[in-house]
A protein has these predicted regions:
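Short, exposed "boundary/linker" segments that immediately precede the start
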Residues: 1-6
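A nucleotide- and high-energy phosphate-metabolite-utilizing enzyme signature
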Residues: 7-285
Length: 285
């Protein structure tokens, strides 16, 4: 395994085969590179963190035994998706984004396609927050790809159709822009260039209109800023205040006991959770 990993990153190769981050394995650098299913289960159920749950939402088999992969996913599913309304995970997602913002402050914060305001991370965090919160009870939300998850959230009336369309358009744009930045400059970077000439090159690759270098660069930045402004605003609005979530969590247990409780929970308490624009309809679906 280590030999394959080293070969994939070998300097003699013209390009990277795969970029693999071994620190993402159980226990990070101190953990075994290869783990048994039992070891994985013990680790995730005992020490697994929210960011690992988020990462595993997107996990898939890329090589080796598909049956082993299926067994792993069946084993790990209860770790990713909890039966209870998981408001603690929402708090941790907010904390992670706060730490990212703090680390970027004054350093590559502007024009960071992935980690900056309204960037790719905020799109994914918005989607994954809904999946972690509600996926334990609704298996249809256990979708690996982000666009598919957005579609399901819209079908469940958890995202409005308008928000879904804007979010999808923004995500596709940002992913395409990220890919073109990396292809153009041959680097694993998420930063927009800080000069007009390179921005104009990117604008052409993004099929932007413009009759001059300046107009191309300006048009690219205008579209980028419109998308990130929408995503950043939605991300901020989608997270309810802590007190509202705690109130809903308190009522959650009561809502389990009877059909009457479910009616009360739907109409009164879910309305307090800003993650759900149409709580009553979403709950019935």
């Amino acid at each position: 395994t280590t030999e394959i990993y080293t070969l994939s990153l070998h300097d003699a190769l013209p390009i990277y085969v795969f970029r693999v981050d071994l620190e993402l394995r159980p226990e990070g650098n101190s953990g075994e590179i290869v783990n048994s299913l039992t070891s994985c289960e013990i680790y995730y159920q005992s020490w697994g963190r929210t960011w690992e749950r988020q990462a595993l939402i997107k996990a898939r088999v890329s090589a080796g035994s598909e049956n082993l992969g299926k067994e792993f996913f069946e084993m790990i599913e209860p770790f990713i998706y909890r039966k209870s309304l998981d408001f603690e995970a929402i708090e941790e997602i907010k904390s992670m984004k706060y730490r990212i913002n703090k680390s970027l402050k004054g350093k590559h914060s502007k024009g960071n396609i992935k980690l900056g305001f309204g960037g790719i991370r905020e799109v994914e965090f918005t989607i994954q927050a809904h999946q972690l919160l509600l996926g334990g009870r609704d298996k249809s939300l256990r979708v690996r790809d982000s666009l598919g998850a957005m579609k399901t959230l819209c079908e469940k009336n958890i995202l409005t159709e308008e928000d879904h369309d804007h979010l999808r358009e923004a995500y596709v744009f940002l992913r395409n822009l990220e890919n073109r930045v990396q292809i153009t400059f041959g680097l694993q970077t998420y930063l927009l260039p800080d000069n007009e000439a390179d921005l104009a090159v990117l604008a052409r690759k993004m099929r932007m209109l413009g009759d001059s270098q300046k107009s191309l660069a300006d048009n690219l930045m205008k579209v980028y800023e419109n998308h990130t402004r929408f995503v950043g605003t939605l991300f901020a609005e989608q997270f309810a205040e802590k007190e509202k979530r705690e109130a809903a969590e308190t009522f959650y247990g009561e809502g389990d006991r009877s059909r009457i409780g479910e009616e009360q929970f739907t109409e009164s308490m879910l309305a307090e959770i800003s993650l759900l624009p149409d709580p009553k309809r979403a709950y019935r679906l």
